[in-house]
């Protein structure tokens, strides 16, 4: 039976690959009930979503406390937890999601994959400050709003990891009207013109 990866080659251990495969099956099982990812993209789950999440982990600093906000379908949060179990076991991962059904999915997916995460059912803008070392968000909001969440939840020397599509330059220019920040753009391997924005030093203008 096909696992949906096609010819995709991943530089991970057999155990990590097995966990990723378990995650893909759990997501496909839950998706019709609570729409974790679009039906259009579910057939391209490995390259569109899983590989996209892997590159976020690979570009981020190692260790410390990692907060994924608007975790929804566990992308990148559960993928980060799967990779960290092998490559960075000291990383403490928190997934923040306001939808209770999606929180139930996240807990189930973590359990099925055998990884440790803390799932918090809270609204990002009103949750207590997390003081995390790494903050990630995927397909959640525009950069201006994401930087507001980063200012609230990142530790002083923390790093934000935000995958963005081909219009990322406009988002950066717009965000600079209200924010000062250092930004590295890492070219995405999953979508032409897309990047991962690696951001530090967030403060209001």
From Swiss-Prot:
What are the protein's UniProt keywords?
Answer: Cytoplasm, Methyltransferase, rRNA processing, S-adenosyl-L-methionine, Transferase
One Pfam family matching this protein: GidB
Q: Which reaction does it catalyse?
A: guanosine(527) in 16S rRNA + S-adenosyl-L-methionine = N(7)-methylguanosine(527) in 16S rRNA + S-adenosyl-L-homocysteine
This molecule's function is given as:
Specifically methylates the N7 position of guanine in position 527 of 16S rRNA.
Give the main localization category: cytoplasm
Amino acids binding S-adenosyl-L-methionine? 70, 75, 124-125, 138
* Highest taxon in the source lineage: Bacteria
InterPro entries given in the database record: rRNA_ssu_MeTfrase_G, SAM-dependent_MTases_sf
Gene it is expressed from: rsmG
Is Mitochondrion included in the keywords of this UniProt record?
no
Gene3D superfamilies (UniProt xref): Vaccinia Virus protein VP39 (3.40.50.150)
EC number(s) recorded for this UniProt protein: 2.1.1.170
**Name assigned to this protein:** Ribosomal RNA small subunit methyltransferase G
């Amino acid at each position: 039976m096909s696992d949906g990866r096609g010819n995709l080659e991943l530089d991970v251990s057999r155990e990590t690959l097995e966990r990723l495969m378990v995650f893909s099956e759990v997501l496909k099982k839950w998706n019709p009930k609570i729409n974790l990812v679009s039906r259009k993209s579910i057939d391209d789950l490995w390259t569109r979503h899983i590989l996209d999440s892997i590159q976020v982990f690979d570009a981020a600093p190692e260790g410390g406390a990692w907060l994924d906000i608007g975790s929804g379908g566990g992308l990148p949060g559960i993928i980060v937890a799967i990779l960290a179990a092998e490559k960075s076991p000291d990383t403490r991962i928190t997934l923040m999601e306001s939808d209770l059904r999606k929180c139930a999915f996240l807990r189930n997916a973590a359990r099925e994959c055998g990884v440790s995460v803390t799932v918090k059912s809270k609204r990002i803008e009103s949750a207590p400050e997390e003081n995390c070392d790494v903050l990630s968000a995927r397909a959640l909001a525009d950069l201006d709003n994401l930087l507001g969440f980063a200012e609230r939840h990142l530790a002083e020397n923390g790093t934000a990891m935000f995958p963005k599509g081909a219009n990322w330059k406009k988002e950066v220019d717009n965000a600079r009207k209200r924010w000062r920040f250092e930004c590295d753009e890492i070219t995405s391997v999953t979508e032409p013109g897309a990047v991962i924005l690696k951001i530090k030093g967030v403060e209001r203008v």
